[in-house]
Regions:
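Basic/aromatic-rich interaction segments and small domains that mediate binding to polyanionic partners
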Residues: 146-185
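A composition-biased, non-transmembrane "mature-region" signal
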Residues: 19-35, 46, 53-55, 86-91, ...
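A short hydrophobic beta-strand element
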Residues: 40-48, 141-143
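Intrinsically disordered, low-complexity, charged/polar segments
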Residues: 81-126, 173-197
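Short coil-to-beta transition motif at edge beta-strands of beta-rich domains
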Residues: 132-149
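A short, surface-exposed beta-strand/turn
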Residues: 61-78
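Negatively charged, low-complexity tracts enriched in Asp/Glu with abundant Ser/Thr
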Residues: 2-42
């Protein structure tokens, strides 16, 4: 299915609430209800959706995944768009939060099983990054592999320095030659921190 765009959220507070409402309904044959949902980075919606069939009382909980585009200031007036799918389609997006994955019932779909495994691997990687110690001013950071910079230098050891323009980020001063560097996504690199003596 393609993208569906609209000019309003039909009274809903935001994209997540709109999509929750779209996945919650009662029909003669089944009841559908969102048990838990999340809008990750304002671009992907994940939900644990419960289907209960009225004739058999069979209950299944599967993952709904929607790509989201939300721009309240869109020039053409189409402020919200989404593309929906479910886990059985094996979506590329695999950042589903663990609390949603924990609600899903077992499935036979190979694509869904692989997607769930990818989501759990990504969640473990996010936890590992979050638990990794952040460089603090005064420390020395030594990277396991040298980093290449646009000025042609390749360096692996820096002094961590407070950024005078931002209290949330730090700068890195080359230990041997001086000069300040910014290293984005520093936690994605393998390094060790050395405290000052």
């Amino acid at each position: 299915m393609g993208w569906l765009y609209m000019q309003s959220l039909n009274g809903h507070f935001g994209p997540r609430q709109y999509l929750d409402a779209q996945c919650t309904h009662t029909r003669p044959e089944l009841t559908s209800k969102v048990l838990r949902s999340a809008l990750v980075a304002m671009r992907v919606y994940y939900a644990a959706v419960e289907h209960v069939r009225h004739t058999t009382d069979k209950r299944t909980v599967f993952a709904a995944v929607c790509l989201v585009r939300y721009n309240p200031r869109d020039r053409e007036g189409y402020i919200f768009g989404y593309k929906d799918m479910d886990e059985s389609m094996g979506p590329c997006e695999s950042e589903c939060p663990t609390p949603i994955l924990d609600l899903l019932t077992p499935t036979d779909s190979r694509y869904a099983i692989e997607w769930r495994a990818r989501c759990r691997e990504n969640a473990a990687a996010r936890r590992a990054l979050a638990n990794k110690p952040s460089p603090r001013p005064g420390q020395t950071i030594a990277f396991d592999r040298p980093l290449s910079f646009s000025n042609g230098r390749t360096l692996d050891r820096f002094e961590v320095v407070a950024n005078p323009r931002s209290h949330r980020t730090v700068l890195f001063r080359a230990a041997d030659i001086g000069g300040f560097y910014r290293i984005s996504n520093v936690k994605k690199h393998s390094y060790r921190l050395i405290d000052p003596a």
